[in-house]
């Protein structure tokens, strides 16, 4: 060896030789030293790196070559406390021994240490390593009955807590809350627990909630939170599902593509209809350059199987051309035959230049010299589909080793003999085809990428290796497998040893779950294989890390570890199935559940359509396991804590090490291709004095383990119920009729908790709903010992092989006729003779148009029947249609002569027939109070002019309580829209007064309480949708620029009063109060902000005094004391103003009530005296009015007092009732006021508008509580000269019952007699329609129609153009409503309504009961307002009548205008009739 050159000949030796000699000499010296003393034994101590707090764990210990008595001690050091885990004397090597020990409880993530000592006569072994103690809390999951809800539906959900062994925990949840999309808390339940370990809760959604994602938040005692989201949207369940099947990708060389569209009903039958298909490729657009996409489109009928397959040429799309987007967009629109309903499905097809791809699979990243290296190469196409029978070239270190051919799965297995490979690294490359290196500008060339893999040689000091053969597929629970282990051992130290012990240890979820020992005879050969038997169980899920090791006499630990994926399973085995796979709707089916005895099983079954509408992350084994904080512990970094210990072995120089014929390069970091890496991957700490690491370089640059706590970095793999194609045939000569009447269509069918008996089985019978669909059921179960378990989904197809479907519009106008269509579906596998009958009725005349007679319907076909319907009267009209099979032989099918089953299906639907014109109402109210007396009175009901014939509906009612009518109608006090933040409060606030009044008078029943609280809950949810982020409220919420001071105060005080009955978020209230306080000026008065579209709410006066009085009242009614800073300053404002002359009556009434409510007697009395001067009296009653109207100013459409007058009068009444030292004389004065207020009530207990209803009911409730008499006994009789007589009895038991009767004639004169004691509230109501009146008051309105499209074979469509302006006496109107009644058979196009909001043309749009309601803000005097939207026909009405349009001031309804419009498609429709 030439180790010197030139002038360096003076060196004694070159550096390499010198180092070799030094190492040799050192080895000789060490050998002599070792001969002088007994060799120390080898040991292995194993403990999980993460110990789970307050639970048992395991430690495993082994000694090898032990030949003297030693004292062994293992200690857990934590928080200055040492806990002895293991302490004993031992003299022999007894193999691997494991024992349990208890981990102390901790409150947080804690660092601890395990110390090991072993003392003998000639040696003293010590090691100390870090571990982590993890505070393992229970984890919580939430399940809702559905993933999506409609407004007004109830949400049902469950909460379950499990420990880390998946056993149920009886948690007490301090708080379970529901948040809306704006993070407002709308429901909460405190200190919730359940003895069965399943909490089940239900709550309602308001009819008009905030749409979007809601959260259920569950808080545990520790403060840890779990959340679950669900969606609230307006939706219609899809009747069928549309799927597009197309290749996921195309290559630039593909010449065609096949697209298949299928439409299938949810009950599994094909859809009959047509499909519009378009396939498009877009250009890449740069700057302002926009090009239309290249498309192929067509429309075709679906085949009888509901599918359509079509082959398209790809030539037009120029797949290999640059300048286009690299995808095709497929869109399919399927429309049912003779229906408007359609569904759309889309798919994107990517375009790739990659013709094929190679990938190495099932390979190891290390090779062990002497053990064959196995692997697979997979060849796939652009869709990842296998390419078979192709030759793959494999290069090892850039040399072609062999050619391999792919099998039918596209896989080519390979093996490499490593016995003669010495390289520290192998470079593997797989090649299929070589890509063409020729490129043309503007064109995309195909490519065939190769695959590369780098494999490192595993380090072993003795060149001994163990390799566990991996399994690349998940193992299922209960499965028995034999695991193959390869080994090769260096013969050094085995001269006299024939049997070698191999040990194996399994880790899962951070615990030792498996240990064992295999004895192998190595006498014949030091390399070979052995098998480890493995029985998979739930303890090993979701991943088992298996370590196989042996202790080599040359003081090396030879090992390998591998990760096996295990099916996510549970100890509690749950099975769920329906007794049948298919059954008729409305029949009974059994749901059979099997689980561990005494389990409680939570079952859910939902309509498959729900899951089509919104796919959800179903509760599954996957989702439950994902909640476990330690699914698969790998490595030494957990939850930000680094548990890496310093290497025990001394470092070496940076020169390559030559040992046993191999060169090794020392590591420059602590991690390398060695056994330590396998041990580390187990997530276990290993204490050993055997070699496990590749040597590490001694340099300052050596990468040391980071500090224990990390701010970032990778973490250790943790994650926090008899149906077939036909019904079975009965014996010959016996005929059965299977009849169904369908009316129950839920979305969630089953939501139950079922107890499993001691046999481990339960069977529950359910009635299948009427929905023809597939039901998906699932169950999870909990039991204290068996723990948690869950079933795979079970399905039931609820189906009718024969049924009829009737389609009706929502309503029509009296005098119109329309076409009704019934479709009869036959899903039997043979033709049948049918009879279809529309039940005769006195309410309509029906004329069959087609077909001319009944006939046969063949298999998988439907038949349509059409009648022309002529309604005779008004009101709800019921249509009952029955379809039945009859006389099968008439269809000339010989094989069916012996069938003895008939089918009959009936469907009942209702249609509203409305009178023409506009609905109106007049009432007469009488509050009669007496004591043992008789009162008689004549009552006349006159008929107004311009009444639509047949529309008047007079009635008479009586109730024994001043609040009785309002209590019965608290949800419908006004027959007006409620689509904004002001109007919603009329649905909310009166419930508070009703509850408070009934509570004070001890009349509150559970039924009334439940109903009114339900309304409060709903109103609370809805009102939050009008809240701004700063805590204020406005009419249309965030659509308004800022919150409104007046409305915010109203909401604040109402929520405060409601908090006695329902949950109100304190944080919401606190934020609102802060906002109100910021609006107070230095003089104590409040500034007005925001636009309030109700001038009446402000008494028509734009001044800060009325606002300040109102806010002061609100804060006092909210429960704040006079010492509150805001209130104290507010009264400074009011007292200063009271020293001046306040002339406005509305402001006087407000200020009077404020001072009376605050107990300021002198000022209160002063204002009441002043108000008395302006009081009006009529028929013994007293009231106040804002401005006296002259006769010409009064509306021809309505005849009631101004709502402001009711409001003022009510405030005066409240002032009287709350004045300090109230006297009997005050109550007498109050009774006269009450008489006048009562006379203004409508038939539902409300008044003319919003604020007058709220304040008047508050005042009436206060008066009723102050004058309540518990004794009521009255007999009321009403009669007429035409033999009509009706007698009512009112007593203490039924005083809140609203008793009603229709009156026989109008116009008419009636006599009324009241006899007894107590008060009764009597009312006559006349509801009627009027023809559109001429003229207008306050508004102008015109309606135009345009852009009509009226084809014969498709639904008609046109635009409605509304042009209006305000012409009243004020500078602007209040909020305006335009009520557009839909023409019979037409519906609005939703997208056009949405556009009105998006363009800020209107503030709100509602579509209810065939009316489009458009909300406009204040309209300025004579300012033109134009609104346009589209309507389309969804039903054929053959002789349609005009539809009315009304515009009116919501708060001053006497200001109005009316108009009407007709369909531009009328001529075409009338020809069809």
Curated annotation (Swiss-Prot):
Cellular compartments annotated: Secreted
SMART domains named in the record: A2M, A2M_N_2, A2M_recep, Thiol-ester_cl
Recorded GO MF terms: serine-type endopeptidase inhibitor activity
Family statement drawn from the similarity comment of this UniProt entry: Belongs to the protease inhibitor I39 (alpha-2-macroglobulin) family.
Subunit structure: Homotetramer, which consists of two pairs of disulfide-linked chains.
Role summary: Is able to inhibit all four classes of proteinases by a unique 'trapping' mechanism. This protein has a peptide stretch, called the 'bait region' which contains specific cleavage sites for different proteinases. When a proteinase cleaves the bait region, a conformational change is induced in the protein which traps the proteinase. The entrapped enzyme remains active against low molecular weight substrates (activity against high molecular weight substrates is greatly reduced).
Protein name: Ovostatin
Species per Swiss-Prot/TrEMBL record: Gallus gallus
């Amino acid at each position: 060896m030439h180790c010197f050159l030139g002038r360096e000949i003076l060196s004694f030796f070159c550096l390499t030789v010198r180092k070799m000699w030094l190492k040799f000499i050192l080895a000789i010296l060490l050998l002599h030293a070792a001969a002088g003393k007994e060799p120390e034994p080898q040991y292995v101590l194993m403990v999980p790196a993460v110990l789970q707090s307050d639970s048992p764990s395991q430690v495993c210990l082994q000694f090898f070559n032990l030949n003297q008595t030693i004292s062994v001690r293992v200690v857990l050091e934590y928080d200055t406390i040492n806990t002895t885990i293991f302490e004993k004397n031992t003299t022999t090597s007894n193999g691997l021994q494991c024992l349990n020990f208890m981990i102390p409880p901790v409150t947080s993530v804690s660092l601890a240490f395990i110390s090991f000592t072993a003392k003998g006569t000639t040696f003293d072994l010590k090691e100390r390593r870090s571990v982590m103690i993890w505070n393992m809390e229970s984890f919580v999951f939430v399940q809702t009955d559905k993933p999506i809800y409609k407004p007004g539906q109830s949400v049902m959900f469950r909460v379950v807590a499990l420990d880390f062994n998946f056993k149920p925990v009886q948690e007490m949840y301090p708080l379970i809350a529901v948040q809306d999309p704006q993070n407002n808390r709308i429901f909460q339940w405190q200190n919730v627990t359940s003895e069965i370990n399943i909490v089940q809760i239900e709550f309602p959604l308001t009819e008009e909630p905030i749409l979007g994602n809601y959260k259920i938040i569950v808080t545990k005692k520790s403060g840890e939170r779990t959340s679950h989201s669900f969606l609230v949207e307006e939706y219609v369940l899809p009747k069928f599902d549309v799927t597009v099947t197309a290749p996921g990708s195309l290559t630039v060389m593909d010449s065609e593509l096949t697209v298949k569209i299928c439409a299938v009903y949810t009950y599994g039958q094909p859809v009959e209809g047509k499909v519009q298909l378009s396939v498009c490729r877009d250009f890449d657009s740069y700057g302002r350059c926009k090009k239309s996409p290249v498309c192929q489109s067509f429309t075709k009928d679906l085949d009888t199987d509901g599918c359509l397959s079509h082959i398209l040429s790809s030539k037009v799309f120029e797949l290999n051309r640059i300048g286009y987007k690299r995808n095709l967009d497929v869109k399919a629109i399927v429309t049912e035959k003779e229906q408007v309903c359609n569904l759309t499905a889309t798919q994107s097809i990517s375009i790739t230049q990659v013709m094929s791809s190679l990938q190495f699979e099932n390979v190891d990243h290390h090779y062990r010299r002497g053990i064959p290296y196995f692997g697979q190469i997979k060849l796939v196409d652009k869709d990842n589909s296998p390419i078979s029978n192709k030759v793959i070239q494999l290069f090892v270190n850039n040399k072609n080793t062999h050619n391999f051919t792919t099998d039918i799965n596209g896989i080519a297995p390979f093996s490499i003999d490593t016995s003669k490979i010495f390289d520290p690294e192998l470079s593997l490359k797989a090649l299929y085809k070589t890509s063409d290196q020729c490129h043309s500008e503007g064109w995309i060339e195909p490519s065939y990428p190769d695959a590369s893999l780098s494999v490192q040689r595993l380090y072993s000091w003795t060149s001994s290796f163990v390799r566990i053969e991996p399994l690349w597929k998940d193992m299922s629970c209960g499965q028995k497998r034999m695991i193959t282990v390869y080994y090769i051992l260096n013969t050094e130290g085995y001269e006299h040893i024939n049997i070698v012990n191999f040990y194996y240890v399994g880790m899962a979820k951070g615990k030792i779950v498996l240990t064992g020992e295999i004895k192998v005879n190595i006498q014949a050969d030091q390399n070979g294989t052995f098998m480890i038997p493995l029985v998979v169980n739930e303890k090993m899920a979701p991943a088992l890390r298996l370590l196989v090791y042996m202790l080599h006499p040359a003081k090396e630990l030879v090992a390998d570890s591998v990760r096996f994926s295990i099916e996510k399973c549970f100890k509690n085995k749950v099975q769920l199935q329906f007794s049948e796979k298919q059954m008729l709707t409305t029949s009974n089916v059994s749901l059979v559940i099997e689980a561990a005895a005494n389990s409680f099983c939570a079952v859910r079954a939902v309509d498959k359509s729900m899951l089509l509408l919104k796919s959800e992350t179903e509760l599954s084994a996957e989702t439950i396991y994902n909640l476990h904080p330690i699914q698969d512990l790998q490595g030494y970094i957990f939850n930000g804590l680094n548990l890496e210990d310093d290497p025990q072995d001394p470092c070496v120089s940076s020169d390559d090490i030559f040992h046993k014929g191999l060169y090794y390069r020392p590591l420059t970091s602590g991690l390398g291709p060695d056994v330590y890496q396998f041990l580390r991957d187990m997530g276990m700490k290993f204490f050993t004095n055997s070699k496990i690491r590749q040597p590490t370089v001694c340099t300052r640059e050596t990468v040391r383990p980071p500090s224990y706590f990390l701010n970032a970095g990778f973490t250790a793999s943790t994650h926090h119920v008899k149906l077939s194609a036909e019904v079975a045939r009965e014996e010959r000569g016996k005929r059965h009729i299977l009849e169904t009447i369908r009316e129950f269509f839920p979305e969630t069918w089953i939501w139950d908790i079922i107890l499993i008996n001691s046999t481990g089985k339960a069977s529950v019978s359910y009635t299948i709903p009427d929905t023809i669909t597939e039901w998906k059921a699932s169950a999870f179960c909990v039991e204290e010992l068996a723990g948690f378990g869950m079933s795979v989904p079970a399905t039931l197809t609820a189906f009718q092989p024969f049924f009829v479907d009737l389609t009706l519009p929502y309503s029509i106008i009296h005098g119109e006729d329309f076409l009704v269509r019934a479709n009869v579906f036959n899903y039997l596998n043979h033709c049948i003779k049918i009879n279809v009958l529309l039940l005769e009725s006195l309410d309509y005349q029906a004329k069959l148009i087609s077909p001319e007679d009944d006939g046969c319907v063949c298999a998988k076909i439907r038949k349509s029947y059409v009648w022309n319907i002529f309604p005779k009267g008004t009101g709800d009209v019921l249509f009952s249609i029955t379809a039945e099979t009859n006389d099968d032989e008439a269809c000339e099918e010989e094989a069916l002569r012996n069938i003895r089953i008939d089918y009959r299906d009936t469907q009942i639907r209702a249609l509203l027939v409305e009178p023409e014109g506009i609905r109106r109402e007049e009432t007469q109210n009488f509050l009669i109070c007496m004591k043992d007396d008789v009162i008689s009175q004549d009552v006349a009901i006159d008929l107004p002019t311009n009444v639509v014939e047949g529309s008047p509906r007079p009635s008479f009612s009586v109730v024994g309580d001043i609040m009785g009518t309002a209590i019965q109608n608290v949800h419908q006090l006004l027959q007006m829209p409620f689509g904004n933040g002001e109007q919603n409060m009329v649905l909310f606030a009166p419930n508070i007064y009703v509850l408070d009044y009934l509570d004070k008078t001890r009349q509150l029943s559970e039924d009334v309480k439940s109903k009114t609280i339900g309304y409060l809950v709903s109103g609370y949810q809805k009102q939050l949708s009008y809240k701004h982020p700063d805590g204020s409220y406005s009419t249309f919420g965030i659509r308004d620029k800022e919150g409104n001071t007046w409305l915010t105060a109203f909401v604040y005080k109402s929520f405060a009063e409601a908090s006695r009955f329902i949950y109100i978020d304190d944080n919401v209230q606190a934020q609102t109060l802060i906002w109100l306080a910021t609006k107070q000026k230095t003089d104590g008065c409040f500034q007005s902000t925001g636009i309030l579209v109700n001038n009446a709410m402000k008494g028509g006066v734009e001044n800060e005094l009325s606002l300040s009085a109102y806010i002061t009242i609100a804060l006092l009614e909210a429960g704040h004391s006079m010492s509150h800073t805001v209130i104290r300053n507010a009264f400074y404002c009011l007292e200063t103003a009271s020293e001046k002359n306040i002339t406005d009556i509305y402001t006087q009434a407000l200020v009077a009530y404020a001072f009376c409510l605050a107990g300021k007697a002198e000022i209160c009395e002063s204002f009441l005296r002043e108000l008395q001067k302006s009081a009006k009296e009529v028929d013994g009653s007293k009231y106040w009015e804002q401005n006296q109207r002259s006769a010409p100013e009064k509306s021809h459409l309505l005849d009631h007092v101004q709502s402001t007058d009711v409001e003022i009068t009510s405030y005066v009444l409240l002032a009287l009732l709350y004045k300090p030292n109230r006297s009997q004389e005050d109550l007498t004065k109050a009774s006269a006021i009450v008489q006048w207020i009562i006379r203004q009530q409508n038939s539902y207990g409300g008044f003319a508008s919003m604020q007058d209803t709220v304040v008047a009911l508050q005042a009436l409730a206060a008066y009723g509580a102050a004058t309540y008499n518990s004794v009521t006994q009255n007999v009321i009789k009403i009669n007429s000269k035409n033999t009509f007589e009706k007698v009512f009895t009112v007593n203490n038991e039924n005083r809140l019952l609203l008793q009603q009767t229709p009156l026989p004639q109008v116009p008419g004169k009636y006599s009324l007699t009241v006899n007894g004691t107590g008060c009764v509230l009597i009312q006559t109501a006349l509801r009627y329609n009027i023809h559109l009146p001429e003229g207008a008051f306050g508004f102008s309105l015109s309606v135009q129609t345009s852009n009509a499209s009226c084809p014969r074979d498709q639904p008609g469509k046109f635009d409605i153009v509304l042009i209006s302006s305000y012409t009243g006496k004020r500078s602007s109107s209040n909020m305006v409503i335009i009520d557009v009644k839909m023409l019979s058979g037409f519906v609005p196009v939703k997208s056009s309504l949405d556009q009105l909001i998006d363009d800020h043309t209107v503030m709100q749009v509602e579509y209810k009961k065939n009316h489009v309601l458009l909300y406009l803000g204040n309209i300025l005097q004579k300012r033109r307002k134009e609104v346009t939207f589209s309507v389309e026909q969804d039903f054929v009405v053959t002789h349609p009548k005009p539809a009315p349009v009304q515009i009116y001031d919501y708060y001053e309804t006497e200001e109005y205008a009316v108009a009407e419009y007709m369909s531009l498609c009328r001529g075409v429709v009338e020809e069809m009739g």
